[in-house]
Amino acid sequence: MLSMFMCNNIVDYVDDIDNGIVQDIEDEASNNVDHDYVYPLPENMVYRFDKSTNILDYLSTERDHVMMAVRYYMSKQRLDDLYRQLPTKTRSYIDIINIYCDKVSNDYNRDMNIMYDMASTKSFTVYDINNEVNTILMDNKGLGVRLATISFITELGRRCMNPVKTIKMFTLLSHTICDDCFVDYITDISPPDNTIPNTSTREYLKLIGITAIMFATYKTLKYMIG
């Protein structure tokens, strides 16, 4: 079951991850000065991850290579255009998420690899993943486990060779991960924005947080379409 590898690994490292990065975040936050869309529900698809999967296995002819080149160009232009349209506030959240998710991935590389290897032997739907993540986040309120979950889900996206299905997974999981606790953590790190109306601050920040998580997978998308 999916719960075996997620609960037995992510949850086991929650305290270590929280204790290891919260102080760093508080230290760096003191220097951080410059910083009605409805998402479609994903299909009930099954994921099977295999770290030995090589994209070269799918590029056997010249036509395959040319099509991949065209696909990469079009996708990259679209991603770049979407990124340029984001407001400064959202980009500041992207920077924060990138920095600390990368830190978690690097500092806990061995632990993450254990989870990735276990995931490579399992088949499960995106709803299985979402349910387990939701349970974990309800039981654990720390920032570390949320950053670890983003890093973990992003890596699963790298190992799934279907970009369309992976985007759907990111869409659903971004809503689940971006709960009130995560919004509070990120907004505490980020400098205040006086342009946000007080009456809708939380709703606005939650929407911005979801958008930021989606674009925090920017490098992953480039990896998949490259």
Curated annotation (Swiss-Prot):
GO terms for cellular component: host cell mitochondrial outer membrane; membrane. One of its GO terms (biological process) is symbiont-mediated suppression of host apoptosis. InterPro entries: Bcl-2-like_sf, Orthopox_F1, Poxvirus_F1/C10. It holds the Pfam family M11L. It comes from the Viruses. Induction: Expressed in the early phase of the viral replicative cycle. Disulfide bonds: none annotated. The keyword Cell inner membrane does not apply. It is found in: Host mitochondrion outer membrane; Host cytoplasm. Keywords: Host cytoplasm, Host membrane, Host mitochondrion, Host mitochondrion outer membrane, Host-virus interaction, Inhibition of host apoptosis by viral BCL2-like protein, Membrane, Modulation of host cell apoptosis by virus. Belongs to the orthopoxvirus OPG045 family. Homodimer. Interacts with host pro-apoptotic protein BCL2L11 (via BH3 domain). Interacts with host NLRP1. Interacts with host BAK. Plays a role in evading host innate immune response by inhibiting host inflammasome activation. Interacts with and inhibits NLR-mediated interleukin-1 beta/IL1B production in infected cells. At the host mitochondria outer membrane, interacts with the BH3 domain of host BAK and prevents BAK from binding active BAX. In turn, host apoptosis is inhibited. This is Apoptosis regulator OPG045. It comes from Vaccinia virus (strain Copenhagen) (VACV).
